[in-house]
Design a protein with these regions (language model features):
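Gly/Ala-rich beta-loop-alpha elbow adjacent to hydrolase catalytic centers
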Residues: 110, 114, 119, 123
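N-terminal beta1-alpha1 cap of cysteine-dependent amidohydrolase-like domains
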Residues: 1-107, 120, 127, 131-157, ...
Length: 234
């Protein structure tokens, strides 16, 4: 069975917290957990550790899920607003994971924040706020994307678009990192998917394929998952 690691979201203690909430909590949103396990894959949550290289040796692939902002400090900027300071602890850990799995030749798939993290890990930067792509509707917020002609996603899906996706974010890729190519854009030009140009599998989408299951008109998230798992089994 294919063994996939997923980096956790982190819930940090807040002022006035009591009980278990005085501790750092590691968690996974159920939607992405069930999506990954809908195929023949065994999922492992990877708690904070300095053993990223050991995780990379033991597992077949890595998934980076959504969650908190990337700290602008990670790409050499100051937060434009205090609430956009992000989670530097998670940033540093996930950057280590991306580098370890890539060095081991293991595939990496980024979802939402994961796409931004991969871009930053490889030397890119982010727009700190894209208000038009943010919504309180969460998994009901959708827009169209166009797949880049000749891209891996265009080959995977057999067309370039437009196709609807669930996409909720207020940060987005600004300066594309070396070693990445654009795979899809929103109608306003915002980068919505990237892929590594090297020999290993590295793909990331700004949208949430785990929310697409069975919804008419939405890009099939299963095809992307199958591509990632095929790379993990190679």
């Amino acid at each position: 069975m294919t063994r996939i690691g997923i980096s956790p979201r982190l819930l940090h203690p807040q002022p006035g917290a009591r009980g278990v909430f005085t501790k750092i909590l590691h968690y996974v949103e159920d939607g992405i957990a069930q999506w990954l396990q809908s195929r023949d894959a065994l999922l492992f949550v990877l708690p904070l550790s300095q053993r990223s290289a050991d995780y990379a040796r033991a597992l077949d692939g890595l998934v980076l899920q959504g969650g908190a902002d990337i700290s602008p400090l990670a790409y050499g900027e100051e937060p434009l607003q205090p609430e956009w300071a992000g989670d530097p602890i998670r940033d540093r850990y996930e950057i280590d994971l991306v580098r370890a799995f890539s060095a081991a030749g293991k595939p990496v798939l980024g979802i939402c924040r994961g796409a931004q993290l991969i871009n930053v890990a490889l030397g890119g930067s982010l727009h700190q706020d894209i208000p038009a792509h943010r919504s309180d509707d969460y998994d009901q917020h959708a827009h169209e994307v166009h797949l880049e002609p000749g891209s891996g996603l265009a080959r995977l899906y057999g067309e370039t678009g437009p196709r609807r996706v669930v996409s909720i974010h207020h940060q987005a890729i600004k300066r594309l990192a070396p070693g990445l190519q654009v795979e899809a854009r929103a109608e306003d030009g915002v980068i919505e998917a990237v892929r590594g140009t090297g020999s290993g599998y590295l793909c990331a989408v700004q949208w949430h394929p785990e929310f697409h299951g069975g919804r008419d008109g939405f890009l099939d998230g299963g095809a992307l998952l199958d591509e990632f798992l095929q790379a993990a089994r190679a």
